[in-house]
Curated annotation (Swiss-Prot):
Coiled-coil stretches noted in the UniProt entry, renumbered to this chain: none
Gene3D superfamilies xref list: 4.10.860.130, S15/NS1, RNA-binding
Single Gene Ontology BP annotation: translation
Keyword terms, alphabetized: Ribonucleoprotein, Ribosomal protein
Gene: RpS13
Entry annotated with the keyword Ribonucleoprotein: yes
Name recorded for this polypeptide: Small ribosomal subunit protein uS15
A single cellular component GO annotation: nucleolus
Species whose genome carries this gene: Spodoptera frugiperda
Length: 151
């Protein structure tokens, strides 16, 4: 998929293994993986951070192949899912950091332009999540209250 606000085509990506079966050398069962997700979710880790932890320390390449569900679905079933989707959360966090930078550097025109691009991405993503009913229909991004969302 191409980039939204950059000329890059975005061709490079990691390839998933062709086989969707669990590797024979993996000793963890689906219940063990779900238990690990529960422990890491209790600590406040995001689904992508949990996936990295499981991959690096437990050798679970794809949680979906082992458990049959994605990490976020498992977290939702356990009641540990974040209230804001992860990609939207990090875009808001980036916008808050850019606003803080612009308060200190008022003449930074390029950062002001990039902030407009980031905020347009936030609005676009919020519109998508409203149609998928992940966010409530009356949810609105406001720059004044954004720092409270990511704090």
């Amino acid at each position: 998929m191409g980039r939204m606000h950059a000329p890059g085509k975005g061709i490079s990506q990691s390839a998933l293994p062709y086989r969707r079966s669990v590797p024979t050398w993996l000793k963890l069962t689906a219940d063990d993986v779900k238990e690990q997700i529960f422990k890491l979710g209790k600590k406040g880790l995001t689904p992508s951070q949990i996936g990295v932890m499981l991959r690096d320390s437990h050798g679970v390449a794809q949680v979906r192949f082992v458990t049959g569900k994605k990490i976020l679905r498992i977290m939702k079933a356990m009641g540990l899912a974040p209230d804001l989707p992860e990609d939207l959360y990090y875009l808001i966090k980036k916008a808050v950091a850019m606003r803080k930078h612009l308060e200190r550097n008022r003449k930074d025109k390029d950062s002001k332009f990039r902030l407009i691009l980031v905020e347009s991405r936030i609005h676009r993503l919020a519109r998508y999540y409203k149609t998928k009913s992940v966010l409530p229909p009356n949810w609105k991004y406001e720059s004044s209250t954004a720092s409270a969302l990511v704090a």
